[in-house]
Amino acid sequence: MPAGAAATGQVRYRPEVTSTAITIGASSIELVQGDITRQAVDAIANAANAALRGGGGVDGAIHRAAGPGLLAELRERYPDGTPTGTAVATAGHNLPARWVLHAVGPVWSGGTEGEEALLASAYRSCLELADELGATSVAFPAISMGIYGYPPHPGARVAVRTAAEYVAGETQIRVVRFVLFSEETYERFADGLAELG
C-alpha cells in the first residue's frame, strides 16, 4: 500500500509532511505529520498518565523507543507520579531527543471540569521545563486528544495558542513542533494555527 493510503477504518497517515509553520518573534511553530519518537529536537513531550508508568498510544510508543531506562528513571525520580496539568522531565534514553517532558493532560469530561485550563497548563509546563533545561527545540504530540477524548478542534486551538503566547515572551525556545499522527488531527492543528493569523 503506498504511503498515505489507508484501508477503510484506518487512520490516514503521511510520514513526515511539514506544510504549515508560522514565525512569532525569533521562534517558529511548526506542524508535522509523523512519528514523534524520530524527531531530532532537544526535547519531546509525552502524553503521559498521572502515574507516569507508560501506557498506550504516544506514551507507549515513546516508552518502547526510549527503552527500559525511561520507566526505571520515572519510577526512581517520580514514585508518586505528577498531577494533571503538570509535566516532569527525564533523559531521552534511546531517543534522538535529549529529554522527554512527561505532560499529564486532562481526560475530557464534556468541558465542564476545567479541561481547557488543565490542557493549557500541561503544554505551558512542558515549555517552562524546556526553558529550564536549556532546550531550544521542543516537539509535542496532541496531548489528551487520543484515549483521553479531548476533541481535536478545541484541543488544537488550546495547544497552538498556548505555544504562541509562550514564545511571544522571553524564551530561548526557537522551534515548537507539533508532531501529529493522523491527517484529521493535523488539519485541526492547521486550523488552529490559521486562527492565530
Q: Which sequence ranges carry the predicted segments?
A:
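Glycine-/small-residue-enriched capping loops at alpha/beta junctions
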Residues: P2-G4, V11-E132
